């Protein structure tokens, strides 16, 4: 079994062009999703969502939806010192998420999504967390094997609408134009 795990870890590292150093390793989230699709048969409807565009309730609703669908979440965040990628694989009745930090079981457990602060970070975790992995949070959603019955949900932000008229009468038609519409998700 150890040999099979080693071979899988090697294949994963090669697939994402992993950079290694004595202090840790790393790859970009977009590369990870591409590799899962291209080399490991995962569904092409995966998407990356940035937490910047959602309030806490909306974000937790998305997390719970993914986990309720039996899909683990590849999650990223940064402290003042370093960034880290880890897995969310559950939640409890108090809205704490279960985190597998990827450090051989060290510090795995339930955390508030707003703080995500392990007590003693593992390799690559930095010497002082500086408040946890609370910056630049995002997640890859829709992570599942390829199947024909999947769909992808895009999330959009609308920050400005313009009307064709400045005043309106009841039952009168007018045009609304979306001036600034942003796609807050990306597919791979």
Locations of regions flagged by a protein language model:
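Cysteine-nucleophile protease catalytic domains, especially the papain-like/related folds used
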Residues: 1-49
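Catalytic Cys-His active-site segments of thiol-dependent hydrolases/isopeptidases
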Residues: 94-113
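Short linear sequence elements within intrinsically disordered, low-complexity coil regions
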Residues: 15, 45, 115-116, 173, ...
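Short, compositionally biased P/S/T/A/G/V-rich stretches that sit at domain boundaries
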Residues: 130, 136-186
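A recognition module on extended beta-rich or small alphabeta surfaces enriched in W/G with H and D/E
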Residues: 107-146
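Active-site-adjacent substructure of cysteine-protease-like catalytic cores
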Residues: 34, 38-100
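Surface-exposed charge patches in extracellular/virion surface proteins
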Residues: 3, 65, 162-165
């Amino acid at each position: 079994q150890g040999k099979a795990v080693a071979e899988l870890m090697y294949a994963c590292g090669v697939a994402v062009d992993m950079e290694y150093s004595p202090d840790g390793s790393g790859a970009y989230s977009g590369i990870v999703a591409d590799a899962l699709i291209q080399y490991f048969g995962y569904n092409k409807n995966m998407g990356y969502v940035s937490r910047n565009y959602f309030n806490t309730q909306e974000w937790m609703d998305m997390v719970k939806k993914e986990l309720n669908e039996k899909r683990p979440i590849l999650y990223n965040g940064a402290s003042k010192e370093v960034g880290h990628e880890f897995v969310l694989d559950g939640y409890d009745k108090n809205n704490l998420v279960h985190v597998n930090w990827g450090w051989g079981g060290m510090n795995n457990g339930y955390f508030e999504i707003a703080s995500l602060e392990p007590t003693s970070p593992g390799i690559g975790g930095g010497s002082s967390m500086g408040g946890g992995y609370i910056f630049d949070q995002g997640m890859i959603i829709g992570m599942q094997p390829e199947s024909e019955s999947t769909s992808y949900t895009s999330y959009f932000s609308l920050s400005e609408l313009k009307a064709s008229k400045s005043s309106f009468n009841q039952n009168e038609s007018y045009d609304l134009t979306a001036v600034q519409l942003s796609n807050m998700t990306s597919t791979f």
